[in-house]
Amino acid sequence: MSIQRKILNDVERITNPAKIFGTHFPFRVEPFVYDMAGTLSRNYVGGFWNMYALDNGGFYMAPDSGTPFHVSCMNGYEGTLSVDAFGLTVCLYAYSNLSFSEVLAETCAEQYHLLREYLLEHPEVHEILAAID
């Protein structure tokens, strides 16, 4: 059975991340995601991000852009990712890094694994896995 995603509306953009991350979302998680996007792609310049809830309990964000992103990762991966694949990759990097913080360790580790489960069905699975390896 495949994991389904749902784009969050304006109210859900507040309530869904709050249920998962609490008050840490607007102060630690969300800014970290944006910073990570800039680290992974020189052509990321900010902007609005869509937020998605997965029916397995996962959550991720992706830029609301029609332009793919050239990505250069710390592991040596270089390539171009669609907006959705870029968002998945950025969130996976952010969750991985934040899983080492005392307060967010359990939540971010869980979100990492839920998101990784979802990406295994993504059309760009091989590119994303290469980027996060």
What is the role of each PLM region?
Residues M1-G38:
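Terminal domain-start segments
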Residues I7, G38-S41, M74-L81:
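Short, charged/polar micro-motifs that form catalytic or ligand-binding hotspots
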Residues A18, Y34, A53, S72-N75, ...:
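Compositionally biased, low-complexity repeat tracts
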Residues F21, N56, S65, N75-E78:
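Feature targets compositionally biased, intrinsically disordered low-complexity regions
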Residues G22, P26, G38, R42, ...:
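Generic surface-pattern signal
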Residues F25-P68:
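Amphipathic, interaction-prone secondary-structure segments
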Residues P68, S72-D133:
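Polybasic, proline/glycine-rich intrinsically disordered low-complexity segments
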